[in-house]
Amino acid sequence: MAPGSVTSDISPSSTSTAGSSRSPESEKPGPSHGGVPPGGPSHSSLPVGRRHPPVLRMVLEALQAGEQRRGTSVAAIKLYILHKYPTVDVLRFKYLLKQALATGMRRGLLARPLNSKARGATGSFKLVPKHKKKIQPRKMAPATAPRRAGEAKGKGPKKPSEAKEDPPNVGKVKKAAKRPAKVQKPPPKPGAATEKARKQGGAAKDTRAQSGEARKVPPKPDKAMRAPSSAGGLSRKAKAKGSRSSQGDAEAYRKTKAESKSSKPTASKVKNGAASPTKKKVVAKAKAPKAGQGPNTKAAAPAKGSGSKVVPAHLSRKTEAPKGPRKAGLPIKASSSKVSSQRAEA
């Protein structure tokens, strides 16, 4: 009883004393540690803790949520952001919202509705469509600075290009200067002179050939003119025949007159030149009185005169023929042939 009771009596007292001693210590440090964390996070949460996205992104979300045809007002955007993100600092929110709207307009993410004259963080805003978002940034960027820079760059390279174009002109001038040198080389060549002489000779031949052709060409109109001349020639021939026939008639008439005067000359003027038998008889009779002397000679004398009376029948006919009117169109050859035939018959 003594050892166990003693121990049991001591233990509660020790425990009570320990609990009483620990309880105030544990309570003291507890509040001290518990009081530090609430004060600690309150001071450290402002600089370290950022529990909302950038203001521009919140503005875009607000416009997407309350999308309207005429756009969303700035007051509606503020209410949406404060309701969704209560941790935003209200004091700085007005300034941050104004900056976010300006950056959105500059980047082409936001746009004002038509016929809106508001400026800054007033009025209403709209989202730009996606296809316009891609086009507008390109238009805005080149429209302001890049295009001017491009123009400046374009003007810059043009000057070297012009400088490059000048050397080709110099080269052209050099080529032009070289061409006269090429022209100076041909004169010493004999082949060129011979070729020129041949060309000149060929040109002269061509001119001669052309002149020969020109000379040959005129006879063609002569051939054309020959037709009327041939017709005139026929008339001339007919006239010549007529003149010849008239001349022949005149000659025959003269011959007949000569024959009528004397028989001898008529016989000598015969064309064929053959003596007729009547002529022989007349010559024989003329010789006969010459052979005999006396009165026979006187009788022979009248025979001479009678020789003119005794004329062949064909001769008498011939003398009568030209006196009468000759028929037109009868050829002379026919009359001459008739005379020759009559002589042959005699």
Curated annotation (Swiss-Prot):
* One annotated GO molecular function: double-stranded DNA binding
Compositionally biased tracts (Basic residues): 128-137, 172-182, 278-288
Task: State the disulfide connectivity.
Answer: none
Q: Which Gene3D superfamilies match?
A: Winged helix-like DNA-binding domain superfamily/Winged helix DNA-binding domain (1.10.10.10)
Cross-referenced SUPFAM superfamilies:
Winged helix' DNA-binding domain
Q: Where is this region: Disordered?
A: 1-50, 121-346
- Point to the regions of Low complexity compositional bias: 1-23, 38-48, 298-309
Q: Where in the cell is it found?
A: Cytoplasm; Nucleus; Chromosome
Tissue expression as described in the entry: Oocyte-specific.
Q: Which GO terms describe its cellular component?
A: cytoplasm; extracellular exosome; nucleosome; nucleus
- Superkingdom of origin: Eukaryota
Q: Where is the composition biased (Basic and acidic residues)?
A: 148-167, 205-225, 251-262
**What is this protein identified as?**
Histone H1.8
The gene from which this protein is expressed is: H1-8
